[in-house]
């Protein structure tokens, strides 16, 4: 039957209710339910073919010269060995 018997689950449930309270558990349950609904909706939306909007002509804008985001860069550095402290339980 595993580690937990039905009696163990009842005790765990009582402890959880005492710690968190019914109000917080109710809010948690509704949040989980909404998350599941959103997930199912997203999965169903993925199954439907997406309507392709007509492509809008875009004007090509030249990238500014010297843009740091588009330029490759290299970082020159050396690694330094760090002395690890001696653990007391290994002595």
From Swiss-Prot:
It is found in: Cell inner membrane. The chain crosses the membrane at residues 1-21. Residues 41-91 are annotated as: Disordered. Pfam families: TatA_B_E. One of its GO terms (cellular component) is TAT protein transport complex. GO terms for biological process: protein transport by the Tat complex. Coiled coil: none annotated. It is a single-pass membrane protein. Residues 78-91 have a biased composition (Basic and acidic residues). One of its GO terms (molecular function) is protein transmembrane transporter activity. The keyword Transmembrane applies. It comes from the Bacteria. InterPro entries: TatA/B/E, TatA/E. Keywords: Cell inner membrane, Cell membrane, Membrane, Protein transport, Translocation, Transmembrane, Transmembrane helix, Transport. Residues 51-64 have a biased composition (Low complexity). Part of the twin-arginine translocation (Tat) system that transports large folded proteins containing a characteristic twin-arginine motif in their signal peptide across membranes. TatA could form the protein-conducting channel of the Tat system. Belongs to the TatA/E family. The Tat system comprises two distinct complexes: a TatABC complex, containing multiple copies of TatA, TatB and TatC subunits, and a separate TatA complex, containing only TatA subunits. Substrates initially bind to the TatABC complex, which probably triggers association of the separate TatA complex to form the active translocon. This is Sec-independent protein translocase protein TatA. It comes from Pseudomonas syringae pv. syringae (strain B728a).
